[in-house]
Amino acid sequence: MLTVTVAQDGSGDFASIAEAVLAVPYEEEALVQVGPGIYREKLVCEKRCITLRGVGADKTKLVWGDGGKLPHKDGRPTHTFRSYTAFFSGETLCVEDMTIENDAGPGAKAGQAVAAYVDSTRAVFRRVKLLGSQDTLFCAPLPEKEREKDGFLGPRSLAPRKPTAQYYTDCEIAGDIDFIFGGGDALFENCVIRTVDNRIPHSYVTAPSGKADGLGFVFWNCDFVSDCPAGSVYLGRPWRPEGKTAVLDCRLGAHIAPEGFIAWNDRTDTGLASFAEADSTGPGAAERPAWVKQLSGPEAAELLAHARTLCRPKIN
Protein backbone atom coordinates (compact mmCIF):
# COMPACT_ATOMS: atom_id res chain seq x y z
CA MET A 1 0.00 0.00 0.00
CA LEU A 2 1.20 3.49 -0.86
CA THR A 3 1.32 5.79 2.19
CA VAL A 4 1.61 9.56 1.91
CA THR A 5 1.50 12.17 4.65
CA VAL A 6 0.02 15.65 4.79
CA ALA A 7 1.25 18.28 7.24
CA GLN A 8 0.69 22.01 7.18
CA ASP A 9 4.05 22.67 8.83
CA GLY A 10 5.96 21.17 5.91
CA SER A 11 7.02 18.00 7.71
CA GLY A 12 4.92 15.71 5.48
CA ASP A 13 5.05 14.67 1.86
CA PHE A 14 2.48 17.35 1.01
CA ALA A 15 1.04 20.47 2.62
CA SER A 16 -2.51 20.01 1.29
CA ILE A 17 -4.92 17.10 1.11
CA ALA A 18 -5.73 17.80 -2.52
CA GLU A 19 -2.05 17.61 -3.53
CA ALA A 20 -1.64 14.31 -1.73
CA VAL A 21 -4.72 12.76 -3.34
CA LEU A 22 -3.71 14.01 -6.78
CA ALA A 23 -0.33 12.29 -6.42
CA VAL A 24 -1.91 8.86 -5.86
CA PRO A 25 -2.19 6.76 -9.05
CA TYR A 26 -5.81 5.74 -9.58
CA GLU A 27 -5.20 1.99 -9.47
CA GLU A 28 -2.91 1.97 -6.43
CA GLU A 29 -4.31 1.29 -2.97
CA ALA A 30 -3.32 4.24 -0.80
CA LEU A 31 -3.40 5.65 2.72
CA VAL A 32 -3.32 9.43 3.09
CA GLN A 33 -2.43 10.37 6.66
CA VAL A 34 -3.50 13.94 7.40
CA GLY A 35 -2.01 15.84 10.31
CA PRO A 36 -3.73 18.40 12.52
CA GLY A 37 -4.96 21.69 11.15
CA ILE A 38 -7.77 23.40 9.29
CA TYR A 39 -7.37 22.59 5.60
CA ARG A 40 -9.37 25.13 3.65
CA GLU A 41 -9.72 23.20 0.41
CA LYS A 42 -12.32 21.96 -2.04
CA LEU A 43 -11.40 18.31 -2.50
CA VAL A 44 -12.01 15.98 -5.43
CA CYS A 45 -11.01 12.40 -4.58
CA GLU A 46 -11.58 9.83 -7.34
CA LYS A 47 -9.41 6.78 -6.61
CA ARG A 48 -9.90 3.04 -6.84
CA CYS A 49 -9.12 2.31 -3.18
CA ILE A 50 -8.13 5.08 -0.79
CA THR A 51 -8.18 5.84 2.93
CA LEU A 52 -8.05 9.37 4.32
CA ARG A 53 -7.08 9.29 8.00
CA GLY A 54 -6.86 12.32 10.27
CA VAL A 55 -5.72 12.51 13.88
CA GLY A 56 -9.16 13.24 15.33
CA ALA A 57 -12.32 15.01 14.24
CA ASP A 58 -11.51 18.00 16.44
CA LYS A 59 -7.93 18.23 15.16
CA THR A 60 -8.05 17.50 11.42
CA LYS A 61 -10.63 19.61 9.57
CA LEU A 62 -11.38 19.95 5.87
CA VAL A 63 -13.48 23.08 5.33
CA TRP A 64 -14.91 24.94 2.34
CA GLY A 65 -17.80 27.34 1.85
CA ASP A 66 -19.58 27.00 -1.49
CA GLY A 67 -23.37 27.33 -1.51
CA GLY A 68 -25.99 26.62 -4.14
CA LYS A 69 -27.12 30.24 -4.31
CA LEU A 70 -23.60 31.60 -4.56
CA PRO A 71 -22.05 32.38 -7.97
CA HIS A 72 -19.92 29.75 -9.67
CA LYS A 73 -16.88 30.64 -11.75
CA ASP A 74 -18.90 29.87 -14.91
CA GLY A 75 -21.26 32.74 -14.11
CA ARG A 76 -24.21 30.57 -13.12
CA PRO A 77 -25.32 29.77 -9.58
CA THR A 78 -23.30 26.98 -8.01
CA HIS A 79 -26.38 24.81 -7.39
CA THR A 80 -26.47 21.89 -4.96
CA PHE A 81 -24.15 19.35 -6.52
CA ARG A 82 -21.25 21.71 -7.21
CA SER A 83 -21.31 23.08 -3.66
CA TYR A 84 -19.48 20.14 -2.05
CA THR A 85 -16.48 20.54 0.22
CA ALA A 86 -15.39 16.98 -0.68
CA PHE A 87 -16.43 14.86 -3.67
CA PHE A 88 -15.59 11.16 -3.36
CA SER A 89 -15.79 8.59 -6.14
CA GLY A 90 -14.06 5.37 -7.15
CA GLU A 91 -14.49 1.81 -5.91
CA THR A 92 -13.59 1.80 -2.20
CA LEU A 93 -13.31 4.75 0.18
CA CYS A 94 -12.52 4.97 3.89
CA VAL A 95 -12.49 8.25 5.83
CA GLU A 96 -11.48 8.26 9.50
CA ASP A 97 -10.90 10.68 12.36
CA MET A 98 -11.53 14.02 10.72
CA THR A 99 -14.15 16.72 10.12
CA ILE A 100 -15.56 17.63 6.72
CA GLU A 101 -17.50 20.88 6.87
CA ASN A 102 -19.33 23.26 4.56
CA ASP A 103 -19.41 26.61 6.33
CA ALA A 104 -21.37 28.55 3.69
CA GLY A 105 -24.09 29.12 6.27
CA PRO A 106 -27.86 28.66 6.46
CA GLY A 107 -29.81 27.84 3.32
CA ALA A 108 -31.70 31.13 3.36
CA LYS A 109 -28.42 32.88 2.61
CA ALA A 110 -26.26 30.29 0.86
CA GLY A 111 -28.71 27.72 -0.48
CA GLN A 112 -27.86 24.04 -0.45
CA ALA A 113 -24.32 23.50 0.80
CA VAL A 114 -22.98 19.94 0.62
CA ALA A 115 -20.13 18.94 2.92
CA ALA A 116 -19.58 15.42 1.53
CA TYR A 117 -20.76 14.14 -1.85
CA VAL A 118 -20.22 10.37 -1.59
CA ASP A 119 -20.30 8.59 -4.95
CA SER A 120 -17.85 5.75 -4.17
CA THR A 121 -19.18 2.25 -4.84
CA ARG A 122 -18.38 1.32 -1.23
CA ALA A 123 -17.67 3.91 1.45
CA VAL A 124 -16.87 3.74 5.16
CA PHE A 125 -16.76 6.71 7.53
CA ARG A 126 -15.46 6.17 11.06
CA ARG A 127 -15.34 8.83 13.78
CA VAL A 128 -15.99 11.59 11.25
CA LYS A 129 -17.91 14.83 11.73
CA LEU A 130 -19.91 15.97 8.70
CA LEU A 131 -21.07 19.51 9.38
CA GLY A 132 -23.25 21.95 7.46
CA SER A 133 -26.75 23.35 7.20
CA GLN A 134 -28.88 22.38 4.19
CA ASP A 135 -27.94 19.16 2.34
CA THR A 136 -24.85 18.29 4.41
CA LEU A 137 -24.37 14.68 3.26
CA PHE A 138 -25.30 13.45 -0.21
CA CYS A 139 -25.38 9.67 -0.55
CA ALA A 140 -25.25 9.12 -4.31
CA PRO A 141 -26.69 8.26 -6.76
CA LEU A 142 -28.88 11.04 -8.06
CA PRO A 143 -32.49 10.35 -9.00
CA GLU A 144 -33.06 9.54 -12.66
CA LYS A 145 -34.58 12.91 -13.54
CA GLU A 146 -34.24 16.42 -12.17
CA ARG A 147 -37.31 18.50 -11.35
CA GLU A 148 -35.71 21.86 -12.10
CA LYS A 149 -33.42 23.06 -14.87
CA ASP A 150 -29.77 22.58 -13.84
CA GLY A 151 -30.97 20.90 -10.66
CA PHE A 152 -28.37 18.14 -10.98
CA LEU A 153 -25.59 20.30 -12.42
CA GLY A 154 -22.39 18.79 -11.10
CA PRO A 155 -19.87 15.97 -11.47
CA ARG A 156 -22.39 13.16 -12.09
CA SER A 157 -25.32 14.92 -13.79
CA LEU A 158 -24.93 12.96 -17.05
CA ALA A 159 -23.46 9.75 -15.63
CA PRO A 160 -25.33 6.45 -15.26
CA ARG A 161 -26.92 6.05 -11.82
CA LYS A 162 -24.88 3.35 -10.11
CA PRO A 163 -25.76 1.92 -6.69
CA THR A 164 -23.60 2.66 -3.67
CA ALA A 165 -23.26 1.04 -0.24
CA GLN A 166 -22.21 3.37 2.57
CA TYR A 167 -21.42 2.77 6.24
CA TYR A 168 -21.16 5.44 8.94
CA THR A 169 -20.12 4.50 12.46
CA ASP A 170 -19.40 6.67 15.51
CA CYS A 171 -19.92 9.77 13.36
CA GLU A 172 -21.65 13.09 13.95
CA ILE A 173 -23.76 14.50 11.13
CA ALA A 174 -25.19 18.00 11.52
CA GLY A 175 -27.51 20.19 9.45
CA ASP A 176 -31.04 21.51 9.21
CA ILE A 177 -32.87 20.76 5.93
CA ASP A 178 -32.63 17.35 4.22
CA PHE A 179 -29.12 17.04 5.60
CA ILE A 180 -28.83 13.33 4.82
CA PHE A 181 -30.19 12.79 1.33
CA GLY A 182 -29.87 10.80 -1.88
CA GLY A 183 -30.45 7.42 -3.47
CA GLY A 184 -27.64 5.43 -1.87
CA ASP A 185 -27.99 2.53 0.54
CA ALA A 186 -26.53 3.64 3.87
CA LEU A 187 -26.29 2.28 7.41
CA PHE A 188 -25.64 4.66 10.31
CA GLU A 189 -24.57 2.96 13.55
CA ASN A 190 -23.81 4.63 16.88
CA CYS A 191 -23.98 8.10 15.34
CA VAL A 192 -25.07 11.49 16.64
CA ILE A 193 -27.56 13.11 14.27
CA ARG A 194 -27.70 16.78 15.20
CA THR A 195 -30.26 19.19 13.80
CA VAL A 196 -28.90 22.74 13.82
CA ASP A 197 -31.27 25.49 14.99
CA ASN A 198 -31.21 28.06 12.17
CA ARG A 199 -34.52 29.62 13.20
CA ILE A 200 -36.61 28.01 10.48
CA PRO A 201 -40.15 26.70 11.05
CA HIS A 202 -39.37 23.06 10.31
CA SER A 203 -36.31 20.92 9.68
CA TYR A 204 -35.93 17.50 8.05
CA VAL A 205 -33.21 14.98 8.80
CA THR A 206 -33.43 12.66 5.79
CA ALA A 207 -34.61 13.00 2.20
CA PRO A 208 -34.21 9.55 0.61
CA SER A 209 -34.64 9.06 -3.13
CA GLY A 210 -33.81 5.40 -3.65
CA LYS A 211 -35.80 2.72 -5.43
CA ALA A 212 -38.36 0.37 -3.92
CA ASP A 213 -35.98 -2.59 -4.11
CA GLY A 214 -33.15 -0.76 -2.32
CA LEU A 215 -32.26 -0.52 1.35
CA GLY A 216 -32.45 3.26 1.72
CA PHE A 217 -31.21 4.80 4.97
CA VAL A 218 -31.09 2.73 8.17
CA PHE A 219 -30.19 4.22 11.56
CA TRP A 220 -29.34 1.94 14.47
CA ASN A 221 -28.48 2.99 18.04
CA CYS A 222 -28.19 6.65 17.09
CA ASP A 223 -28.90 9.79 19.10
CA PHE A 224 -31.06 12.42 17.41
CA VAL A 225 -30.30 15.67 19.23
CA SER A 226 -31.04 19.37 18.75
CA ASP A 227 -31.68 22.74 20.35
CA CYS A 228 -34.58 23.29 17.92
CA PRO A 229 -38.06 23.88 19.37
CA ALA A 230 -40.01 20.83 20.45
CA GLY A 231 -41.85 19.07 17.66
CA SER A 232 -40.27 21.09 14.84
CA VAL A 233 -38.05 18.46 13.18
CA TYR A 234 -39.12 15.52 11.02
CA LEU A 235 -37.08 12.33 10.73
CA GLY A 236 -37.58 12.32 6.99
CA ARG A 237 -39.53 13.12 3.87
CA PRO A 238 -39.36 11.36 0.49
CA TRP A 239 -37.28 13.31 -2.05
CA ARG A 240 -38.60 10.79 -4.57
CA PRO A 241 -41.78 8.75 -4.07
CA GLU A 242 -40.09 5.42 -3.22
CA GLY A 243 -37.60 6.81 -0.68
CA LYS A 244 -36.86 4.72 2.42
CA THR A 245 -35.73 5.56 5.95
CA ALA A 246 -35.78 3.23 8.97
CA VAL A 247 -34.98 4.26 12.55
CA LEU A 248 -34.11 1.34 14.83
CA ASP A 249 -33.34 1.43 18.56
CA CYS A 250 -32.61 5.16 18.49
CA ARG A 251 -33.02 7.89 21.08
CA LEU A 252 -35.09 10.82 19.87
CA GLY A 253 -35.01 14.28 21.42
CA ALA A 254 -38.04 16.49 22.01
CA HIS A 255 -37.36 18.29 18.73
CA ILE A 256 -38.74 15.35 16.74
CA ALA A 257 -42.31 15.97 15.55
CA PRO A 258 -45.00 13.58 16.79
CA GLU A 259 -45.74 12.47 13.21
CA GLY A 260 -42.10 11.49 12.76
CA PHE A 261 -42.21 11.70 8.96
CA ILE A 262 -43.96 13.94 6.44
CA ALA A 263 -44.68 14.25 2.71
CA TRP A 264 -42.41 16.24 0.39
CA ASN A 265 -43.51 19.90 0.43
CA ASP A 266 -47.12 20.09 -0.80
CA ARG A 267 -47.14 16.55 -2.18
CA THR A 268 -49.33 13.88 -0.65
CA ASP A 269 -47.77 10.83 -2.31
CA THR A 270 -46.55 9.00 0.77
CA GLY A 271 -48.06 5.71 -0.38
CA LEU A 272 -44.92 4.50 -2.15
CA ALA A 273 -42.46 5.70 0.47
CA SER A 274 -41.22 3.34 3.16
CA PHE A 275 -40.70 4.95 6.55
CA ALA A 276 -40.27 2.58 9.45
CA GLU A 277 -39.38 2.63 13.12
CA ALA A 278 -38.65 0.17 15.90
CA ASP A 279 -38.09 0.67 19.62
CA SER A 280 -37.52 4.42 19.58
CA THR A 281 -37.09 5.99 23.01
CA GLY A 282 -36.91 9.51 24.39
CA PRO A 283 -39.30 12.47 24.29
CA GLY A 284 -39.44 12.38 20.47
CA ALA A 285 -40.86 8.85 20.42
CA ALA A 286 -44.60 8.98 19.81
CA GLU A 287 -47.48 7.27 18.06
CA ARG A 288 -46.95 7.78 14.32
CA PRO A 289 -49.39 7.97 11.40
CA ALA A 290 -50.56 4.68 9.95
CA TRP A 291 -48.26 5.01 6.90
CA VAL A 292 -45.18 4.92 9.18
CA LYS A 293 -44.58 1.22 9.79
CA GLN A 294 -43.82 0.02 13.30
CA LEU A 295 -41.53 -2.96 12.90
CA SER A 296 -41.74 -6.00 15.12
CA GLY A 297 -38.62 -7.29 16.85
CA PRO A 298 -37.96 -9.97 14.20
CA GLU A 299 -38.63 -7.52 11.35
CA ALA A 300 -36.20 -4.97 12.78
CA ALA A 301 -33.55 -7.63 13.35
CA GLU A 302 -33.91 -8.88 9.78
CA LEU A 303 -33.62 -5.36 8.35
CA LEU A 304 -30.55 -4.57 10.46
CA ALA A 305 -28.86 -7.83 9.45
CA HIS A 306 -29.52 -7.06 5.79
CA ALA A 307 -28.17 -3.51 6.18
CA ARG A 308 -25.00 -4.77 7.85
CA THR A 309 -24.43 -7.38 5.16
CA LEU A 310 -24.88 -4.81 2.43
CA CYS A 311 -23.10 -1.79 3.91
CA ARG A 312 -20.51 -2.86 6.45
CA PRO A 313 -16.98 -3.30 5.10
CA LYS A 314 -16.00 -6.85 4.30
CA ILE A 315 -12.57 -6.29 5.87
CA ASN A 316 -12.09 -3.84 8.74
Label the predicted regions.
Residues 2-316:
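Sequence-level preference for short, compositionally simple segments enriched
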